[in-house]
Every structure is written in C-alpha cells, then in structure tokens.
C-alpha cells in the first residue's frame, strides 16, 4: 500500500480527529492535527496553534502552555502527548498570529489564567472531530474519550424524549431580572409524588449538551424514577458570579417565585428527600449552600467540581461554607450529598477533599467520587446522571 504524502488532500481525508497508539496497559500516545487554511509557512500568518486540553494543558495545571508544531513546507500542524487509557476530556485549538503570549519561561498560575483569558475567545473546535459543542466559557470544544474511559449512564444509549422540554420566562421581582427556565418531565408517575431536580447552568444542559435523551433513557431503564427537571439559565457570567456563590436572595427567589410557577405547569413532590439541587463549579457550591441553609426544601445535593475555595481564590484560606460547617453555623445532618471532583483540577480537588473530610462522620449519606478529568462538562455529564441515580435510589425501595 502506497504511503500518503503528508499534507496531501488524500492524507487529510484519512484524518478524523486525534489518533492514538497504545504504549502499555495504562497509557496511549495521542496525536492532534490541525490544517492551516492559509497553507504552508510561506503563505500563512499563523505563528502559534495553542492546544487547550481541559485538565491537561489548561491553567489548572500550572504548567507551560503547549503549542502545535508545523511540519515544514505543509499546511499541517501537529502535537503529541500521552494520556491515560481511561481519560476523557474536551479540547480546542487556538490559532493565533501573536507570539508574545506566554513568553515567560515559567509563567505562574495567574499569568497562565490571564494568558488563556486573552486567547480563548479565538478558540475553535477540532474541524476533524464531529463531536463538538459550545463550552461553558462560550468557545467551541471537541470531545476525546480514550478506549477505557468509564461508562457514562444514559449517554451510552440515549433515547428521544416523548415530549419536549417546555421553555418559560421567569421574571423575578426579588432579583430584578428575567431569564429562561426549562421544565422537563419523564415517566407517568402520579404527578404530586414526582421527585424534583433543579439543575443550575440550565442553558448549558438544555442547549449546548442537552440532557433530555440521557434522562429519558435512564427513566425507561428504571434507573431513574419519573421526575420533574427544572433547568435555570444563569443569564450571563456576571449574573452567574453574583447569584450562584452563596447568595440567599437567589435561593429565596427560586423557592418563593420560580417553584410555584413551575408547579402550576408540572406538579412535583414537596418532600426534601425527593428534591435534588445539582450544579458544577459555582453551581456545585450553590447546590450545597441551598441544602445547608434550606434542608427542609432541598434534601439532596449533587455537587461537581464545587468551588469551595470561595471567596478566597488563591486556595490559601478555607472557603466560607467550610468555615460555617466548622463553627457549627450550618449542619449537613440529614442531607444526602454527591461530591465529585477531578484529579486534574488541583485547587478544586483540594477544597473538595477538605469538605469531604469535614462531612466524613456522615459517610453513610455522602457519595464521594474522584474523576480522572478536569473542570470539564464532558466529565460532568456522566457524574450528573450517576449522581441522580445514587440520590434517588431510596425512592425505588419506597415503591417496592
């Protein structure tokens, strides 16, 4: 068989995203490709193609950023790394004409964060990879799942929902703003007995990575009970940063304004042990805050990559919720909690481990999971479904 010439049209047609080769039982060598639309270095103004892999080359790692290398005389850029056989994560490319970002030999964490902040608006998904979506920061990303990545319940065999989600507008008097909210129901249980799940960052789970097929699949397979799901839009990053971190007004508005509006459309149970609040990052922090402060309404908490360092970003001080738990101002007694964090997000993992240690005396009702991943929705989507399964498992015993 004749080898294809690197950079030829037929060579590019043979590429369908990252390629990998097994090194041993635990590791793969993975190569990423990008085609320069301007052609070779003779014609192109592209100086760098940064590779942003969540949990591998992002600012959480405090490591030197990685740039692809051009194969001389071609339109081919490539970069090779090694990944665990069970790794899963998202990535994007950032082609740029600038060569002055990350110029320091070993940038510190804040320099890295600032550099990526400048670059990420230019990020693109991998054109060779059909699995792409708009990430939480607003830029396109693509999926990479290694051969032994853990099963993600519901996402492995999605099913089309019988009825679409209903989108409403919630006009809040308390918060003085308006936002979209999605209401989704599954199954055919008695309406007043249906458990309720409140999902934060609802626009992501409704539009960028819709959860409806996974929820429908798990309900049909009797891994989840028939339920009502309420997905709350964060509006934008400014509102999100104000409303989600430990904000009483937000949760009072949810309880006093939004939930009655939802209940008129899709009735659900008022029981705290049937009610889940789920969120990621600031949303994870917010979910636990809601459970700790209104346990009579929110009895189940699903927190993924929760920002428990807040409000001290440096990670050198205990976060506010940890302080409140330590002083006894709040108690997790009676709550069922899923706590999940990625080993590739060090500061968040450290804060979550400290929280888990604080909650450990209640270990019978705490589900603690470490994930081989970063601050990444591709990891969160599996944990979100598994968390709902774990938190609602007692409901199946109630019905038997």
Curated annotation (Swiss-Prot):
Signal peptide interval: none
Principal subcellular localization: cytoplasm
Domain of life: Bacteria
GO biological process assignments: iron ion transport
Gene Ontology terms, MF aspect: enterochelin esterase activity; iron ion binding
Entry keywords, A to Z: Cytoplasm, Hydrolase
Subcellular localization(s) per the UniProt record: Cytoplasm
EC number from the UniProt entry: 3.1.1.108
Catalyzed reactions per annotation: Fe(III)-enterobactin + 3 H2O + H(+) = Fe(III)-[N-(2,3-dihydroxybenzoyl)-L-serine] + 2 N-(2,3-dihydroxybenzoyl)-L-serine; Fe(III)-enterobactin + H2O = Fe(III)-[N-(2,3-dihydroxybenzoyl)-L-serine]3 + H(+); Fe(III)-[N-(2,3-dihydroxybenzoyl)-L-serine]3 + H2O + H(+) = Fe(III)-[N-(2,3-dihydroxybenzoyl)-L-serine]2 + N-(2,3-dihydroxybenzoyl)-L-serine; Fe(III)-[N-(2,3-dihydroxybenzoyl)-L-serine]2 + H2O + H(+) = Fe(III)-[N-(2,3-dihydroxybenzoyl)-L-serine] + N-(2,3-dihydroxybenzoyl)-L-serine
GO CC terms in record: cytoplasm
Job of this protein: Catalyzes the hydrolysis of ferric enterobactin (Fe-Ent). Is responsible for the release of iron from ferric enterobactin. Also catalyzes the hydrolysis of iron-free enterobactin (Ent). Hydrolyzes ferric monoglucosyl-C-Ent (Fe-MGE) poorly and does not hydrolyze ferric diglucosyl-C-Ent (Fe-DGE) or ferric triglucosyl-C-Ent (Fe-TGE) at all. Also hydrolyzes apo MGE, but catalyzes the hydrolysis of apo DGE very poorly, and does not process apo TGE at all. The catalytic efficiency for processing Fe-Ent is much higher than that for apo Ent, suggesting that Fe-Ent is the physiological substrate.
Record PANTHER family: ENTEROCHELIN ESTERASE-RELATED, IRON(III) ENTEROBACTIN ESTERASE
Family: Belongs to the Fes family.
Protein's name in the database: Iron(III) enterobactin esterase
Lineage of source species: Bacteria, Pseudomonadati, Pseudomonadota, Gammaproteobacteria, Enterobacterales
Gene (name only): fes
